[in-house]
């Protein structure tokens, strides 16, 4: 009898955009769902298989602000996906009106990953419109938006030219010298690569201070990962600078960036070249894993050199007195490379699917 009177609640995961709320209800084989909204409250009740077996599950969520009626939902074999439109397009500091989060509610980290480039463009356009209205009301003849666009255009142009120089240089030398060009790649283009990677710090700063709408974390991870390879693995070890792997690392990095920076450059002047957009969202599929593989090979090749030279190794103080080799940290870094590959590959795939996936169908 106690089980019959008990209200069972499923696990619910949530995320948001400026205009929408996303809820993922962990119920499989759902039947007879009753999903509705009244002002700022979502009502859910359905028969399905959850944590307590096959039962009727229900919950009510009082949102932080008003939402539109008639939520859109989609049933899959494993879950229920619900999309709720906000009444006013804005970012909420939390989902529910009450500050304490319900026990059955948790963030949907897959959805909370960085917004796609298309969503960033929409946010940038909205911010541009608001800035323009504000500046016009103040009677200012100039707009901060134009200055921001000009600054970002020049930044992306400089990076595009730098990586293009590296890419063309390596391509021409390979066509002329063949495999012989592999072994002096570092001494030929390292200065330009140093310049481009140091300038990439600005990209992370731009995201951190709000000049761009890009998320900070992905930019920071790529910056630290590449600079570790460039400055530590290649820069401090002369024995690594004449290895063929340097060519492949630099070539793959530059191949990725010439399309990325050219895409961002055209976005700054409100141009949309469909061919370039397709390349920007597609070429990463082979290039990104190959780039990570080349980085991993460079780390593996450097391990015996660091062991032999003892560089960056240290001995723990008394009473432990254990020598810690730098190669130990390199082995950990190898695991991090492939973990990062998995996370970023999944995220980039979702970006591409959101850009080129099938149009959403409203399912009642």
UniProtKB/Swiss-Prot annotation:
Instruction: Tell me the protein's name.
Output: Very-long-chain (3R)-3-hydroxyacyl-CoA dehydratase 3
**What Pfam families does its record include?**
PTPLA
Q: Which organism is it from?
A: Pongo abelii
For this protein, the Enzyme Commission number is 4.2.1.134
Q: Which molecular-function annotations from GO does this UniProt entry contain?
A: enzyme binding; very-long-chain (3R)-3-hydroxyacyl-CoA dehydratase activity
Which residue range or ranges hold the CS domain?
A: 7-96
Q: Where is the signal peptide?
A: none
Gene Ontology, cellular component aspect: endoplasmic reticulum; endoplasmic reticulum membrane
